[in-house]
Amino acid sequence: MSAKIGVITFPGTLDDVDALRAVRIAGAEPVNLWHADEDLRGVDAVVVPGGFSYGDYLRTGAISALAPVMQSVIEAAGRGMPVLGICNGFQILTEARLLPGALTRNQGLHFHCVDTHLEVVNTDTAWTGTLEQGQKILVPAKHGEGRFQAEPDTIRMLEEEGRVVFRYTDNFNGSINGIAGITNETGRVVGLMPHPEHAVETLTGPSVDGLELFLSAIGTIAA
């Protein structure tokens, strides 16, 4: 049986269909999960995709973090289920306290839509096992509130414990230490602002580098 990877849809989610397609291209079974679901439908991993869930009211990701499906995701993550938060999904994971820090307005207060090179810093996670440390991958980024910030002690902890997963090579949004993605203490929960699901086909993306995250998750599930 192929791995089952769920992708959550919230009101205002934009990239759920792309994430479902990426899961399918990688060879797993995509499962659509609705924000009001309490049952994760037997999935082996979850993707929290990008968009503007609930219109970004209050704070980006703040309302979505309280949705019924996220309570189930929090419990599943506690049991070791791989979870990937992309863009707004990363914001949701920080609001749900599955990952530390916060994503704030970009430096210069501009919305950026760019293809960006990321340095792979940590390959010891559920979502980066097929990548190589130091490898550069090319994926799209599109956000207005993607500047990663945290207290100095938290930044120190992330760096010292090797929990920075991706780093911008150009740091266009002003994130502290160029941090583009991080993981939790187990390496099973990963969040990043750029969009790997938009880099899985040569016809539609700048590369196919993003496919490796989904292939890594499939390998993790099979292990």
Swiss-Prot record:
Reaction(s) catalysed (UniProt annotation): N(2)-formyl-N(1)-(5-phospho-beta-D-ribosyl)glycinamide + L-glutamine + ATP + H2O = 2-formamido-N(1)-(5-O-phospho-beta-D-ribosyl)acetamidine + L-glutamate + ADP + phosphate + H(+); L-glutamine + H2O = L-glutamate + NH4(+)
Taxonomic path: Bacteria, Bacillati, Actinomycetota, Actinomycetes, Mycobacteriales
Name by which UniProt lists this protein: Phosphoribosylformylglycinamidine synthase subunit PurQ
Gene expressing this chain: purQ
NCBIfam families linked: FGAM_synth_I, PRK03619.1
Superkingdom assignment: Bacteria
PROSITE patterns tied to this protein: GATASE_TYPE_1 (PS51273)
Stored InterPro entries: Class_I_gatase-like (IPR029062), PRibForGlyAmidine_synth_PurQ (IPR010075)
Residue ranges occupied by any Glutamine amidotransferase type-1 domain in the UniProt entry: 4-223
